[in-house]
C-alpha cells in the first residue's frame, strides 16, 4: 500500500469531535494536558466553552467526566492509552462502568507504534484491561475513515466506550462508497477458503498485504477487519473459521487478553479450529522509530507473512 494516503487515526478523532460538536451542544470534551498530541484540542479551538483541560490528572478527569455524564451530557475523555487504561482504571471501572454512563474514552498513542516514546508509553495491555469491564464497548479503528465513523457511532451508543487511536500515519483503505461502520460487526475485506486472517487497528492493512502475497503462492486467505473487540462479532468469525479451518489473529497488542484471546474463546465455544495468535509477546517494548520497532517485534508484513506460512505448514 505504498501509494495509498496515510493518516494517523488520532487526526480523525479530532476531526470527528469537531463535526459532532456542530450538531450536538450536549457534547463535552475533556483532556489531561495532552490536547495537542491527542488532537482533542481541535474541539477546544472550535468550542472552548465545551472543552476542559483537566491537567495531568487522568483519574480526576474520568471522575469529572462521570459526574458531568450523570447530568445527561455525553463526554469524551481523552489522553494517551497508557494513562487512561492504566492510571485511571479504577475510576473507569467504578465511576463510569458501574453506573453505565455515557463517557467515551478516546485513548491515543496506543501500542508499539508510539515508537520513540518507549516502553513506558507503549501501551500493549489496554484492550485486555478494558475488555474486563462489564458493559464496556472496545474499539480499535483500522484507518482514518473508520476512526471518524467509530467516534460518531460511539456518540450514538448508549453506554461507556473505549476507543484506541494511533500516532503513526496508516494507510487509508476504507474508501469504498458502500463502507458502513456498525458497532460489533466485523467486515470481510477479502474472501478466502484456506485460512482466515483476523486483524484490528493498523494490522488490518498488514493482513491485506499478507493475503496478497499468500495468493501469489496459491494460498487463498480470507481477511476480516474486527474493529470492535467487544462486543465481538462471534458469528462472523465462527462462520469463517468453519469455512477455512484455520485462523490467524493479528494485533498491535499483547497476545494475552486482546483480540487473539477473544477470538480463541469464541472459537473454543463455537468452532474449534487451529489458531495462531500474532501480537506482542509477554514483554515490554522499547524506544525507536515506529516502523523499526514494529518490525523487531514481528508486526511488519514480512514477519507476519513468515509466521502465517509457518503456521500453515
Segments and roles (model prediction):
Residues 1-164, 169, 180, ...:
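Thiamine diphosphate
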